[in-house]
Regions:
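Assembly/oligomerization scaffold segments
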Residues: 1-103
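Short solvent-exposed strand/turn elements
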Residues: 91-107, 316-328
Length: 328
């Protein structure tokens, strides 16, 4: 009986290190996130003979994953920002994060925008960091009467805007991506494929559903300066409404935050974690997914991939763990 053979490739600043590392590799872990967090690559390498040099921080690692039968899938480029050497036995641990998140994007700034659009702000951020803006049109035309960036990095601003509009807000592959979560499309409008997984595809699963998170609406507050009093807006119904603590500058901003929070609440009611025995490098966050062969509640629910963790090691081969949220 033949078994599938995992395949991987690691390139350091243009030099392919795969053959050199392969006999020493304990495990390779790649975590892909939807936004707000950088994708992360972790390598653990055995250094029993002390012949491996410690990599320098700031070097670039490119990684590809797959199977010998189907080939490799490029998973991006990462910058080494953490190195650990421990023993005995001697082990080198290398941690790298998305190469697109440069130090300049983490530098704090002070500025404001007036009478503009969300698309204009995001285009400015992309241009300053030599990124290609990929902003969904439905969000790009949103009006922003005022926006402050006070002692805040561009990356934090991008994340904050993603929270405000319930959007994927990230930097990947040389592009600044901003698109509605769960839309099933890329920022350019191209449809993402829906994946179907059966119970036979995995060896571990965990499903949970909780009424405590089943809010019927979200109420947000804003300060009416003309009337010098606190007002509120409600998105959804008031039967069991969640109340946001922060007070916003105007009604439109409060409504945007309430709408975004309600969408997050809906996705968080049911959760499904699934580990695939045969890793799938083609899976990534924001893909829609359907399940088959589980309980009725799982099979009838449409799912959205929130996070994927790919692991290659000597004992389990290549596996992929999915964190799924319920999708409307």
């Amino acid at each position: 009986m033949s078994y599938p053979i995992p395949q991987w490739r690691v390139v350091l600043d243009g030099t392919d290190l795969t053959e050199r590392i392969a006999p020493r590799l304990l495990d390779l872990t790649l975590t892909e996130c939807r936004g707000g967090e950088a994708d992360q690559l972790d390598l653990r390498i055995h250094d029993h003979d002390c012949k491996m040099a410690l990599p320098k921080r700031g070097v670039r690692l490119s990684v590809a994953l797959g199977w010998k039968a189907t080939g490799l899938i490029d998973k991006g480029t990462f910058i080494v920002d953490e190195v650990e050497y421990s023993g005995a036995p001697d082990i080198i641990t290398v941690r790298a994060r998305s190469a697109d998140l440069t130090a300049d994007m983490r530098t704090r700034r002070e500025r404001s925008w007036h009478n503009t659009t969300l698309g204009a702000v995001l285009n400015t951020l992309a241009g300053e960091h030599r990124l290609t803006p990929r902003v969904a049109e439905v969000l790009a035309r949103t009006k922003l009467p005022h926006l402050d960036q006070a002692n805040e990095s561009d990356m934090n601003l991008l994340t904050r805007l993603g929270q405000r509009f319930d959007a994927v807000a990230t930097v990947k592959g040389g592009a600044l991506v901003f698109a509605p979560i769960g839309a099933g499309t890329t920022a350019t409008g191209k449809s993402l494929p829906t994946v179907t997984l059966t119970r036979r595809d995995g060896d571990q699963h965990r499903y949970s559903v909780a009424d405590r998170d089943a809010y019927t609406g979200v109420r947000a507050y804003w300060v009416d300066k003309g009337k010098a009093r606190r007002q509120s807006v409600l998105v959804g119904t008031d039967d069991n409404a969640k109340r946001l603590r922060e007070s916003y500058a105007d009604e439109a901003t409060a409504r945007q935050h309430a709408h975004a929070e309600l969408e997050r609440v809906k996705r968080g009611v049911a959760k499904f974690d699934y580990t695939l025995a045969i890793g799938r490098a083609d899976l990534f966050p924001e893909q829609r997914l359907t399940a088959s062969g589980f309980k009725k509640e799982i099979d009838e629910q449409r799912w959205l991939i929130a996070k994927v963790t790919h692991v290659i090691d000597g004992s389990t081969g290549f596996s992929s763990s999915l964190q799924l949220e319920s999708s409307s």
